[in-house]
């Protein structure tokens, strides 16, 4: 999938969830970011657990095939007070990690707190603040759902940190 000759670099951001997995694709060239596309993958809540995970995997694979990103970034799981919910979210996250890895993409992972800090300036930002900043940073994205805004925030975080990490190395 990766195309070393293509500029700008395309980054897929993923906000995994069992009910809704948000995704967003950015084109990045230097410090300039351009919105390409975003959406939500929504498995049938009545489907068997394994089928819901398969739907997520296949949905992410379809996004990769359509938008041909060079790299991917996935938000890490936050610890929930309900261990069962956290475990199920971990399964959804696994689908979000495996699909881009299977496509040969570099896959980075970022904590929720780091994503919030990178996009809003504070690790304690709420969904409304993230949505506001996505509208400011990517005005061509238009109105986004919270899941899409989170996925685009993950992609922005990766875009910024991958450049910073190259400068350090």
From Swiss-Prot:
Residues forming the catalytic site: 15, 75, 147
Superkingdom, taxonomy of origin: Bacteria
UniProt-recorded Gene Ontology molecular function terms: crossover junction DNA endonuclease activity; DNA binding; magnesium ion binding
Binding site for Mg(2+) 2: 75
Listed cofactors: Mg(2+)
Cofactor, how bound (note): Binds 2 Mg(2+) ion per subunit.
GO CC list: cytoplasm; Holliday junction resolvase complex
Catalytic activity, as annotated: Endonucleolytic cleavage at a junction such as a reciprocal single-stranded crossover between two homologous DNA duplexes (Holliday junction)
PROSITE patterns found in the cross-reference section: RUVC
UniProt-listed Pfam families: RuvC
Subcellular location as annotated: Cytoplasm
Annotated signal sequence range: none
Key words of the record: Cytoplasm, DNA damage, DNA recombination, DNA repair, DNA-binding, Endonuclease, Hydrolase, Magnesium, Metal-binding, Nuclease
InterPro entries named in the record: RNaseH-like_sf, RNaseH_sf, X-over_junc_endoDNase_Mg_BS, X-over_junc_endoDNase_RuvC
GO biological process, one term: DNA recombination
EC number: 3.1.21.10
Residues noted as binding Mg(2+) 1 in the record, renumbered to the chain: 15, 147
Family that this chain belongs to: Belongs to the RuvC family.
Xref: PANTHER family: CROSSOVER JUNCTION ENDODEOXYRIBONUCLEASE RUVC (PTHR30194:SF3)
Function, as annotated: The RuvA-RuvB-RuvC complex processes Holliday junction (HJ) DNA during genetic recombination and DNA repair. Endonuclease that resolves HJ intermediates. Cleaves cruciform DNA by making single-stranded nicks across the HJ at symmetrical positions within the homologous arms, yielding a 5'-phosphate and a 3'-hydroxyl group; requires a central core of homology in the junction. The consensus cleavage sequence is 5'-(A/T)TT(C/G)-3'. Cleavage occurs on the 3'-side of the TT dinucleotide at the point of strand exchange.
Quaternary structure and partners: Homodimer which binds Holliday junction (HJ) DNA. The HJ becomes 2-fold symmetrical on binding to RuvC with unstacked arms; it has a different conformation from HJ DNA in complex with RuvA. In the full resolvosome a probable DNA-RuvA(4)-RuvB(12)-RuvC(2) complex forms which resolves the HJ.
Protein name: Crossover junction endodeoxyribonuclease RuvC
Organism: Caulobacter vibrioides (strain ATCC 19089 / CIP 103742 / CB 15)
